[in-house]
Amino acid sequence: MKGLVIAVGFMLLLACQLSANEQSALARITVYWHREGSGEHAAWNGTRLCEEHCAIDPKRIPYGSKVVFPDAECVAVDTGPDVVNRKAALSYGRKVAERDAIVIDRFFGSKQEALAWAQTHPHFMTVRILTPDVKLAGK
């Protein structure tokens, strides 16, 4: 019985690995934070934001995807017009690849944390995006 449980657990882990698509993308990383006095810090859909969350363009990265930065992993739960319009990439990109980059807005609990992270990391970086495989998940 114990062997069966271990085998089933191993198969589930393998299935999870097979059901995820992984891609790398050049991204312009911006930061945002909980604004003092605003009461709540919720995503566009009401999800309470925490430091493991980020905003993305849902046409390029599906909600629920994991975005892997060099120092952390975030879940795509939020969006915004500047992310969708890629304003930061178009404004700050010096090379064509930078101007074509996606924009990911990483959430932090405070302004100090957000600005400290932004000052110590490059504006453009390659991130890994792990998206669930819709076809396998929708069987």
Segments (PLM) and residue ranges:
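Bacterial N-terminal signal peptides
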Residues: 6-15
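N-terminal hydrophobic targeting signals that begin at the initiator methionine
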Residues: 1-2
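Solvent-exposed, well-ordered loop and adjacent helix/strand elements within mature globular domains
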Residues: 19-139
